[in-house]
């Protein structure tokens, strides 16, 4: 009868550890976009109406000549002038100094005078702490992007969002924008600055070799997760 030799438990554990490490390392860290709402919206189709036979034909798609041309409906477009310039500086410091001195004169009994004639105790302590810290950041983002009105709030404000994709060589660049626009801040050129947009979310990301070069490798991420230091 032929005997089958099974692998030892240590070998099985080592194989399982290697398999788990490989699976854990292959897992990519997803980068969730900060803008979760839809990037565009289409206006509802108007109800078909019989043409009255006159020059004036009412309807959703109609843009009267003497009416305000600023966006106000779902599906209208608006140009956002991105002009973000943020500078932040922070500094802090702490300084503590504490000193103490204590003396004790202990009287001794007469029969112990020869042994403890000078029983004087003294204690001196000092504690000093000094620390400083500072941080600074500067971010600048300029550009333009045309967005779409995705919702109209009850007070008339417009919820807008949009995305621009640019394929440069072998890298795909993404610019995403969303926020709430007050129609009164829209200029005659159908544009508004990003500094006038409430709840603005601006995202600039890319996909390609440059982005992959900036991403930590799977094996390095694995050892970084299990390293105790």
Curated annotation (Swiss-Prot):
Signal peptide: 1-25
Lipidation (N-palmitoyl cysteine): 26
PANTHER family: FLAGELLAR L-RING PROTEIN
The keyword Acetylation belongs to this UniProt entry's keyword annotation: no
Record's keyword annotation contains Signal: yes
Protein origin, superkingdom: Bacteria
Protein name: Flagellar L-ring protein
Record note on quaternary structure: The basal body constitutes a major portion of the flagellar organelle and consists of four rings (L,P,S, and M) mounted on a central rod.
Function noted in UniProt: Assembles around the rod to form the L-ring and probably protects the motor/basal body from shearing forces during rotation.
Molecular function GO terms recorded: cytoskeletal motor activity
GO annotations of cellular component type: bacterial-type flagellum basal body, distal rod, L ring; cell outer membrane
Cell compartment(s), UniProt: Cell outer membrane; Bacterial flagellum basal body
